[in-house]
Each structure stands twice: as structure tokens, then as C-alpha cells.
Amino acid sequence: MNSEQTYFFVGIKGTGMSSLALILHDKGYKVLGSDIDKYTFTQRGLENAGIKILPFDEDNIKEDMIVVAGNAFGDDQVEIKKAHEMGLTVQTYPETVEQIIEETTSIGVAGAHGKTSTSGLLAHVLSGVSPTSYLVGDGSGKGTPNARFFVFEADEYRRHFVAYHPDYAIMTNIDFDHPDYFTDIDDVRDAFETLAMQTKKGIFVWGEDENLRKLNAKVPVHYYGTKSDDDFRAENIKRTTKGSNFDVYFHDEFIGNYDIPMFGEHNVLNSLAVIAVSYMEKVDQQEIAKELLTFKGVKRRFTEKRVADMVIIDDYAHHPAEIKATIDAARQQYPDKKIIAVFQPHTFSRTIALMDEFAESLSLADKVYLTDIFSSIREHDGKVSSEDLGKKISKGGEVLKLDNMSPLLDFHDDVVIFMGAGDIQKYEHAYEDLLSNLSLKNN
């Protein structure tokens, strides 16, 4: 890393990019970047840190810069192109992360689902017991002086995580996603195996994932889960409307009893992964148990609020497995309320590839609404629509429009979950405004 130069982030509002920018800023490096004008939830942290966000413009690029290119941008992007013409260093997000994790005990969290929640939980817990830097995919990042640990999210998309050589890796699951890049599940597993082979001390994987069980590695692989053949096991699990409680064993050794203020089976597993890696690093488990109690969650992962008589949940879920986990968590916390799902399909390629799985997961809700498909920067149209998905859903499937959220007014004292990785929040805000205005009129 070069403290004399300015790090310029192309696409600085991206979830990982904003976190990385904050870390470099905390470490004393000069940081600024560019992005679209549209407000994103990652922006607040950058603004609070005093990091400038400029519109895309080749004139932003100066001689004293190192350019960090966001994963969505190629060499034809105007600033990246200008940097190459000027002979400046242009490096990717993963390459930059790899540079800053070398001085610590690094823990990379990978998985098709759950990596942001797990890395956020691990960062919170370890920060409470030892100096810890972290880079989480919800836009949060912190560079702590003399950190013992560095927790970071390792993204499999386009094999970005093969740039990393962490001390430890947590792998929550392997699933077929990103069909615009991966050809099949074997292709995905091959990517994870590459990361496994580059991990230096140990790997922690969910034991019930048959693809993770097939991984080859040069270091010990520890399985965590609820089955008798798992190395780290959660037993005597009690799920209530306040959270979950469970005992943890490492083989036949009792490690401790833990309470978590979180919902859904997936959060028990995420917590178990955190307990496992901290145990192997000989961190006091009483301290771990104490820190687990205070975790408030990560941004856009089961974020709750109450408006009028409704519970509104915002969640990043955009894959069938994530939708299932989110609805399961809502049912645990609100067993006596109807669960209404409002889902924004994310990318045409994913909607086509997982159409039946989406319909099955969404049908776990009591009523389902859809929005139009949110296309990625790499695709502008496709041969599928939300109406096509809606026809396969047994409990609704009506497509909502932003200027008419009134169908949701049929529900009272229930739970509405807005799910998606695009701009689903604008639908949520439109619904909240509608509810608030009605409440004012009725009072």
C-alpha cells in the first residue's frame, strides 16, 4: 500500500467498495471516488467520513492516483481508460483487499447465501474481544490500528475470491447462482475449491452441504451443523419469539450455551460458524457468548420497523434459498401474523434459471406480490417477465406498480417483507408513505 498516493474508487458506492474505502480512510490513506448520482444506502458512511463522491468523469483522474476498479466496470469505463492511458496503477477490489489483510489473522467468509450476515456477526463478536478490522458486504468497513483479526466477505461472483489467501475461511454453503457467469453447480464448486486450496490454517464449512463435503484442501476442514458427524454441533436448540438458544459441542467436548437475539435456523448456523473459528483461535467463549447477545444485524438483512399497525421487514434476499430463510425467520418471530412477501426479481438470467425454485420459496408466504424485474448493469432486457413468475406462484403473484401500492392496504396487523437486491426499497418507502398518510387522516 502507498501512503503517498490517493486511492480513487470507481464505483465507490458499491457495497464492498464503500467498505474498502472506509477501511483505507481509517488507516490514514487519502481516498475519494466516483459513482452514479442516485442515493444508495452505502452513501451515508462515506459522507460521514468526509470521503468525496464525484460523478463519473475522466478529468477526475490525476497523476498521484492508484485506481481501484469496481467489479461492475471494465477497461472501457472512462476513468479506468484514462488511468491506463496515463500509465497509472489500476487494481481490482479483490487485489486491494489481498494487500491489506496480510498483516493480520485473516478470516474470509464465503458462500452463496449468508456471507454478509456471517461476516457482520463475526466482525461484531471479534471486535468486542480483540482489535479487529473488517470489510462487510453491507457497506460497513473499519480499519483498526494494530488489529489482530481481519474479517472480510469473499465473493464467489466471477471468481473474485480467488485473489485471496486467508488464514481461515468460513464457507456457509454452495448453491447455483450467478447463471450469467457460472455454467453449473460443478463450476461453482470448482471456484470454492480454489479458495479452499489457498487457505492457510483451516476451513469451516456447513456439514449438510454435499458440495462442501466434496472439497479438497491442504488444511484441516471443520464441519459445523446439527448432525452427529459434524465437528462443531449445535444441540438442544430452542427457538422462541425472542431468538434462539443452543448448546455447542466440539466433538464430545461441551463448549458452552449461547443465546442469540436472531431468528431462523440459518442464524443458528451462522453463529455456530463464528463460535467455531473463535474457538480454534482460543478466544474466551464466555466473551463470545456475551458479544453474540448484542448483535443488531447488518444493513438490509431482516431490518425491521413498525409503521401504523404493520411490521415492515427489508431484506436483501434475491435467491430462493434466501427467500426461504427470511420467511422462516419471520414466522419464528411473528408466529401469529400473516406474512406478505413483496419480491423484486433480480436479473433476467437468474429469474429464468431459478423460476420454479422462486415460485416454491415465495409460496411459503401467506400472500405474494412481485415488482418488475430489476436488470443488472450487464443486461437490459430479457425473454421473461415478473408476470411469468407470478403465474407459477400458488398464493398470489400480482405485479405491483410503484405508483399504486394500495393492494397492500388490505392487510392489518400483519408482516410485509420487501425482498430483493435491486431498488426494492423505493417500493417499501412508497408503501410506508401510504400507510403514514392514512394514519394521519384517521387520527
UniProtKB/Swiss-Prot annotation:
Its EC number is 6.3.2.8. SUPFAM superfamilies: MurCD N-terminal domain, MurD-like peptide ligases, catalytic domain, MurD-like peptide ligases, peptide-binding domain. The keyword Nucleotide-binding applies. It is an enzyme of class 6 (ligase). ATP binds at residues 111-117. Signal peptide: none annotated. It holds the Pfam family Mur_ligase_C. Keywords: ATP-binding, Cell cycle, Cell division, Cell shape, Cell wall biogenesis/degradation, Cytoplasm, Ligase, Nucleotide-binding, Peptidoglycan synthesis. GO terms for cellular component: cytoplasm. It is found in: Cytoplasm. It catalyses: UDP-N-acetyl-alpha-D-muramate + L-alanine + ATP = UDP-N-acetyl-alpha-D-muramoyl-L-alanine + ADP + phosphate + H(+). The keyword Transferase does not apply. Pathway: Cell wall biogenesis; peptidoglycan biosynthesis. One of its GO terms (molecular function) is UDP-N-acetylmuramate-L-alanine ligase activity. One of its GO terms (biological process) is cell wall organization. It comes from the Bacteria. Its main location: cytoplasm. Belongs to the MurCDEF family. Cell wall formation. This is UDP-N-acetylmuramate--L-alanine ligase. The lineage of its organism: Bacteria, Bacillati, Bacillota, Bacilli, Lactobacillales.
